[in-house]
């Protein structure tokens, strides 16, 4: 189910995950994903207008973290 994000929540998300920050995947709800697992790390490339966090994952994947479906957290590296 696609979830919507308010302008305020989108702004908070963009502040919490600025371009270039490092993230670690907690959970991804994608039955076809074979590369990413919990603990995968990557670099934020951008966040679109529906709140998807696009990441350049260290494993080579470019899958986005979908707002309200998937989960990641910022890490300091």
Describe the role of every protein-language-model region.
Residues 2-14, 18-77:
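Basic/aromatic-rich interaction segments and small domains that mediate binding to polyanionic partners
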